[in-house]
Each structure stands twice: as structure tokens, then as C-alpha cells.
Amino acid sequence: MKKFNIIAAINNDSIIGVKEYGTFSMPWPYLKDDMNHFRKITTDTGSIESGVNAIIVGFNTWQTLPSSYRNIRSRFNIVISRDDETDGQFHKYVKTFDEAIEFASSLTNLNEIFVIGGGVIYDLALKHKLLDKLYLTHVGSNYPIDDNVEKVVHFPLTWSKIEKMCDSNFLELDSEISKHDIGKNILLRFQEYSVKKELYWAIEYLKKNTSLDNKGIIGDKGATGSKGYSLEQHDYYSTEYFWNFYEFITRKVFDLFNSSNEISIPSEECPENQYIELVKTIMEKGIVKQTRNSITKSIFGYQLKYDLSKGYPIQTIKRSYPKAIFEELMWMIRGQTDVSILQKKGVHVWDKNSSKDFLSKYNLPYEEGDIGPGYGFQMRYWGAEYTDCKTSYQGQGIDQLNKCIESIQNNPHDRRIMINLWNCSDLDKMALAPCHFCYMFGVDLYEVPTTSGKKGRLNCHLVQRSWDVLLGWNTTTAALLTYLIANHCDLDPGILVHSISDAHIYQSHIDSGAISQLLQRKCRKFPNLVIRNKKEKIDDYEFDDLIIENYYPCPSISAEMIA
């Protein structure tokens, strides 16, 4: 049978996966460089024509993989499962690890065999006589282990144990390449190891690091008592005895290696509890209403307040989407009203409210994907005559955003620094009247600028007429706008106040169980947001200019967007 390799990504605490609220996920945010590394290693078949790599994976891990991963011609997946399952074009089910290796070795045009997890499968692979190489990504991050976490999946070896194995010449580090994911501020180290002593390393390790020696290795205690064996009495590489003995001895070794050093983060009072209390208040005291687009449970008048110097208020009790929030905000900042611009960037929050059926329903004469003179148009071209989303309005109307920036820079104590999106004369031309309609800004100047050149802090008050509370983006969007303008004007982010008139939850979100899922959860510390540089114009910022550190949300909650 052919030798095989292990490929794994592992964080500082040797964690490879976590389970929260019934969902398994990786213990770090999406890391493009690591995904590209994994794809390159597992799809490269060298010079073999129509070559294929075999992928050995446990059933639970297989269930978490998207179809785009499963159906790649250069990879054939062998799934280890206790149950009988139906094979597919690109995968086969087997019952044991050895059966997986045997089947992989029989594949036509086979290049390499890779074991990709999860934890139990890695454990079997590390103890196997045919293990050849380890491709490990050291993800330089820690996951907050709190009451939300139901299960933590560890790689069987900690980083310190891997280092000791190299020092003792059981493993050899062949190569290491480091990359810094600037946007997440996470260092990645791509490492390749060779197994030097094959199976014998386990016995040698015990001889050197425990009280056992080659004259009295103790076997498992059974009904007939303990039995002692002498290493010199056996030809270990040719007898069946050795493999049974090896299984026992490696269990002892892995008991030594498996000590956990995960970091437990005590729960603290977190600002997101305000949001959770809002949801509870709506559920307990809300009035049921038949509204324009659906039945809601609503309350009138609520306010949230966040100190932006202590964290970026993005939801942690369910996964939010920092890039989508950024792209939608920049779409508005650039005065754009063409939804296809967002769609090309993978953002689809405006699809329903700009569909042909939706526009026809409200007698709007636009092509599909045109929202009319909404958010961004009012922010940058207030008072201009709107034609369609393809027309240029450069130099027309009032640029409220730039006027705000000029006031913040030149007249920071002005009490009229405001962006108003509620233009009554244009409301019937919009696909959707603005849900959030007013940003008001205030500046608190420092007596002396900071060492980094910050002259004060920028505060923001967002006023919103109507809020889909489960979606929850508007707080984060307002915070991000405050961070961007503050950075652009050499200020620190200050206080964000979010005032809502009609705060509501859609009945369909209650009926689907989404709200009950939400209320079972506990929030976490907000991530840190840093903007790496200062651009010439506010329009020029890209998502790669942001660093979002330590964002570890609970799993996403599925909920249909109501148009």
C-alpha cells in the first residue's frame, strides 16, 4: 500500500474545530491564504496525466464540506463512516482507516494520498505505519472557549510536542513559509514535516522519556494479569506481535502528547447584551402588526449606545459578514444605486428590493437592479434630478458627506454636522424609503493630540425609523462609517448612539425558530477594527484597508430577508 500524508490547519491551542449550538466550524475567520494553500497541495497531481489525489476524511468532517469542494476532478474523496452510505462520482464510503488506505492505493493514476481530518481520523493517521509527511498550517490565533462551546476538536499533537519530536529527530521540518493575513492580523506558518523514524519513533520516545525501558515494557492488563516483554526477543518488523504491541505503545505516547493548553475566557459583561435585551423586550412586550410587507412584532422607541474605542459592534451571537457590510456602505458612500455593483462582489442584500417584480409593484420605471434616488444618491447628490443608476451625477446636487468631513476638519464644534437621507420630494421615486435616515456627528477635541496624531474623538448618532432587528446590520454600518470618517479626519472613534423608532421582529423569523436560537446564546467580546492607512478621498477605501482582529462569532442563523 502507498504511503500517505496529513494536511491540517491548527491554531495556537492545537484546536482544529469547534461545535457551538449544534454547528461545527473552524476556530478562526476565513483565511484566503490557507484555503489557497490547501487547494494547491491537494489538487496538484504533478506530471501524471489525468492524475488524481486521494482524500481520506471522516464522516462528520465530510458533512461540513460544501459541494464545490467535494466535486473536484483532481481529488477523489474516501469517507470513513460506520453506516452504509451511497457512493458518488467523486467519493466512496468505507468502514475503516486501513480500508481507506487500501482503496486509495488502488486508484488509477494516483499521485498522493492526503488525510484531512477530523480529530479521530488524524489520531489514527498519526499512529499508522504508512505516514510519510505532515503539511501543517500554524494559525496564529486563539479561540475563546466559553459556555457557548459544546465541543472542542484538537489535533492530537500540540505545537510544543511537535517541536520536541523535531528536537528528538522523530520529525524533520523540511520547509516553512510565513504569511501575514493583514485584514485579520493573523500570522500563518505553512510547514512541511517528514516522518524520520517511521513506526519505531514511538517506542524510542518512550524509552527516552518515561521510566519504561527495553527490558520491561508493560502490556495491557487483562484477565490473566500483566505481562512483561523484552524488546530483544522479537523481530518487530516481521511479526504480528509487533503491530499489536505498537498499538498499545502509541496509545501511551499519545496520552503523553494530548495534554490540552486551551485558553478559557471567563464571561464578561458585553455591550451586545443591549441588543439581546432589545430582542427580549420585543418578544415580551411587542405589539403584533400587519405592516407593508409582513406581520411583525414591534415596539416603538429604543436606544443602543456603544463605546467604539472598546470594540467594533458587529454581532457575535450570530455570524455577521464584515465584507458584505463594508461593500454595502462603500456603495452608498460612492453615491451608487446600481445593485449589480454589489452582486459582482457577492453581496445580495438588495436583490429582492430591486427585482423587476418589486419595482413593478410600486410603479417604478427602472430596470431591474436600480433602487432609484435612495441612500447613496441622497448622501452625495441631494437635490439632483434622478434619471437612473447608470447616469453620472458628478458635480450635481449637494454632497452631504464631503460637507460633513469639511466641518469635522475645519469647524469640529459645529452642532450641524449631519447627513439627512430623508428627501421628501424623492421618496416616491425610491425602491425603498430609507430605514436609517439621519447621521449626526459630534467631535470631542483632546487638549493635546495623541502620539499617533489623533486630535480628538468622533461621535455619531444614527436615527432609524424602522429596523429589522434580527438582521442587525445598521448598528455595525454606522460604526464602520464613524471609524472611516474618524480615520480620514485624524480622530479616534468615540461614542455611537443608535436610536430606533419602530424596532421589529418579523413573525416568520419567530415561527422559523431563528429568534429562539438567538436567545439561547451568549455574546462575546467585540473584535477590534483598525484602518491601516489614510486615503486621499473617502471613496477610495477598500476592504483590504481594514484589519478586523479577534472576530469569533457564534454560528450563523438562517433567516429569510423580507422585502
Curated annotation (Swiss-Prot):
Keywords: Methyltransferase, Multifunctional enzyme, NADP, Nucleotide biosynthesis, One-carbon metabolism, Oxidoreductase, Transferase. DUMP binds at residues 292, 436, 464-468, 474, 504-506. Residues 3-195 form the DHFR domain. NADP(+) binds at residues 117-124. InterPro entries: DHFR-like_dom_sf, DHFR_dom, Thymidate_synth/dCMP_Mease, Thymidate_synth/dCMP_Mease_dom, Thymidate_synth/dCMP_Mease_sf, Thymidylate_synthase, Thymidylate_synthase_AS. GO terms for biological process: dTMP biosynthetic process; methylation; one-carbon metabolic process; tetrahydrofolate biosynthetic process. SUPFAM superfamilies: Dihydrofolate reductase-like, Thymidylate synthase/dCMP hydroxymethylase. The active site is at residue 435. Residues 275-563 are annotated as: Thymidylate synthase. Its EC number is 1.5.1.3, 2.1.1.45. PROSITE patterns: DHFR_2, THYMIDYLATE_SYNTHASE. Gene3D superfamilies: Dihydrofolate Reductase, subunit A, Thymidylate synthase/dCMP hydroxymethylase domain. It catalyses: (6S)-5,6,7,8-tetrahydrofolate + NADP(+) = 7,8-dihydrofolate + NADPH + H(+); dUMP + (6R)-5,10-methylene-5,6,7,8-tetrahydrofolate = 7,8-dihydrofolate + dTMP. One of its GO terms (molecular function) is thymidylate synthase activity. HAMAP family: Thymidy_synth_bact (MF_00008). Bifunctional enzyme. Involved in de novo dTMP biosynthesis. Key enzyme in folate metabolism. Catalyzes an essential reaction for de novo glycine and purine synthesis, DNA precursor synthesis, and for the conversion of dUMP to dTMP. In the N-terminal section; belongs to the dihydrofolate reductase family. This is Bifunctional dihydrofolate reductase-thymidylate synthase. It comes from Acanthamoeba polyphaga mimivirus (APMV).
